């Protein structure tokens, strides 16, 4: 996943089209979520997908659809080459991460991680709704105001 994250971060910075850059950012966030999920941070991986890919990427695409950005592609390399390159490098990246780790695989780990995931989710939920209730309400109000502001800009 490190190779995919590196390539997608370079492409997110280097591509001229903002929509293509957002797609590369989505790939970057999904690969980070997969890395977190595979390392045992189940809740953080799920939250990366929900928050970054779900909310921020949709908000960016909504803002980019409001802007009329015209760009002229002057490069000699076609974007299809980057896509083919990434597709060809995915098996190398996955085999690089699993090479040498297969001997230490614990078969009971997935079952234990499901039990830990429930405990982790319960802990985070109880903390968010008891100790951090006021900041959660403020974050909700900020999100509502940003949605209302985005709707007001479009009209």
UniProtKB/Swiss-Prot annotation:
It comes from Candida parapsilosis (Yeast). The chain crosses the membrane at residues 10-30, 43-63, 75-95, 133-153. Its EC number is 7.1.1.2. It is found in: Mitochondrion membrane. It comes from the Eukaryota. The keyword Phosphoprotein does not apply. It catalyses: a ubiquinone + NADH + 5 H(+)(in) = a ubiquinol + NAD(+) + 4 H(+)(out). Core subunit of the mitochondrial membrane respiratory chain NADH dehydrogenase (Complex I) that is believed to belong to the minimal assembly required for catalysis. Complex I functions in the transfer of electrons from NADH to the respiratory chain. The immediate electron acceptor for the enzyme is believed to be ubiquinone. It is a multi-pass membrane protein. One of its GO terms (cellular component) is mitochondrial membrane. This is NADH-ubiquinone oxidoreductase chain 6. Belongs to the complex I subunit 6 family. One of its GO terms (molecular function) is NADH dehydrogenase (ubiquinone) activity. It is an enzyme of class 7 (translocase). PANTHER family: NADH-UBIQUINONE OXIDOREDUCTASE CHAIN 6. Coiled coil: none annotated. Keywords: Electron transport, Membrane, Mitochondrion, NAD, Respiratory chain, Translocase, Transmembrane, Transmembrane helix, Transport, Ubiquinone. It holds the Pfam family Oxidored_q3.
């Amino acid at each position: 996943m490190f190779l995919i994250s590196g390539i997608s971060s370079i492409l997110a910075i280097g591509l001229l089209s903002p929509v293509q850059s957002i797609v590369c950012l989505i790939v970057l966030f999904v690969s980070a979520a997969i890395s977190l999920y595979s390392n045992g941070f189940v809740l953080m991986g799920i939250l990366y997908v929900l928050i970054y890919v779900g909310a921020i990427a949709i908000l960016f695409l909504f803002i980019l659809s409001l802007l009329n950005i015209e760009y002229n592609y002057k490069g000699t390399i076609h974007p299809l080459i980057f896509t083919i390159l990434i597709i060809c490098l995915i098996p190398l990246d996955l085999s690089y991460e699993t090479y040498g780790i297969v001997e230490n695989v614990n078969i009971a780990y997935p079952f234990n991680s499901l039990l830990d995931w429930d405990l982790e989710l319960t802990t985070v939920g109880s903390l968010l709704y008891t100790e951090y209730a006021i900041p959660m309400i403020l974050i909700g109000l900020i999100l509502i105001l940003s949605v209302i502001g985005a709707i007001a800009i479009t009209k």
